[in-house]
Amino acid sequence: MNKQELSQMSGENQGGDYKFDVPMLTLEGEDGYFRLTQNKQETKLGDDEVKGVMLKFRCQYGAYLNEGERILFTSEEDSAQKVFDLIEITTGKGGKKFTTRIDRGTGKELKEKYPDLKFKQMVYFLLDDDQIVKLQIKGSSLSNLYRTKEQAEAESEDVGYFNQFGKDEYKFEYATILQANQYSKKIGNKTKTFYKIKFVKGEKLDDARMEFVGSQIKYVFDRLQAIAELKASRGQEEQPPVETYESEEPSPEDYEYQE
């Protein structure tokens, strides 16, 4: 048994176990490039597209208000029916920030009380180099996931990625290719160009790759399950500090142009 396993069993570093810390993969919406962000450090990916496998689906809500003087974001959960913690970040005099847990509720309950909240699909994603990252899908990119056949025909668009799979197919059985898809949107009196993520169904994985992907799905599931159990064991009055939640602090581009 190694020291990391012993440390987890002993509980001496439990405070750091509330967060599954992996790089965030996002599409820069104005310039159309993919980037990885971790601990406020950004790495621009040079490729026009990113290829990998979807491992685990989660969701989150957030809002960027008053030019950043007030930011709302929730914990990350498996579905909108789960109970989320809602976190508020406000900026006081001298730029000092105050972070507070202000509410709890399902996605629907929180949206009713805080209508500015926007939904984000989070996907733990295995890159071709075997690095696990967290893909953030928001705004117009969401329609490229969920668009129905009827909506696609009405909008002259592709059917949403999730609706391109047969009943006996699983998303983790196939490579997923992410591309920057250009579109125009009217902002005030001007029309601006933005980018959203286009999802392309790649090749079906061979048996060897599928075995590795299966092990990574289990790894992510076990890690998130351990975090959930640790939070539950603390009780509501002893919930972890807000700084340990599974999210980087939201930035303006996360919400500014969401529909």
Q: What residue spans do the PLM features occupy?
A:
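Extended serine/threonine-enriched, polar tracts that run as long, contiguous segments within proteins
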Residues: 119-204
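Generic serine detector
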Residues: 7-10, 75, 79, 140-143, ...
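Sequence-level detector for tyrosine residue identity
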Residues: 18, 33, 61-64, 114, ...
